[in-house]
């Protein structure tokens, strides 16, 4: 965002918060029982905060978010709303407190689920939550397995076949292929030095 041009403020890096100095409910990392997910609820691409609240109510984990003032706040919580959040100085503190409470209730809700459960249930509801994947998660990811994304590559010096990340896309006319393993430390040093010297 052009913070200087628009509001004459220098933007400093503060993770995923942007110019809002509090965690935005539904946006950012959330801990599950067995790992983490990253949410982006309220963006134009997915379902709304009202949909997330309906899910929480359905599972009897919405606590007081179905009551006012939280319900109305949740129903309107989207990126457009966030752009107007700081326009009324008289209500900023209360809005930030409300957001902090909503986010704490959401954290408790997400913490009751495993990361795959949260991801799969979110997908069915069009809510944007993705798994923060460990290397093991990537190796076991059903979509990546189906696409045969991890590519076996021979490593003769190790006497092993290792799996490398594969093609980022598949094109029919220009197929992707891995030609060889990554070089070992210093393997091409002589070639590189000779080429640089010429």
Please annotate each region the language model reported.
Residues 1-18, 24-27:
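Substrate-binding/catalytic subdomain of NAD(P)-dependent oxidoreductase enzymes
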Residues 60, 126, 148, 197-198:
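Glycine-centered loop/turn motif at secondary-structure junctions
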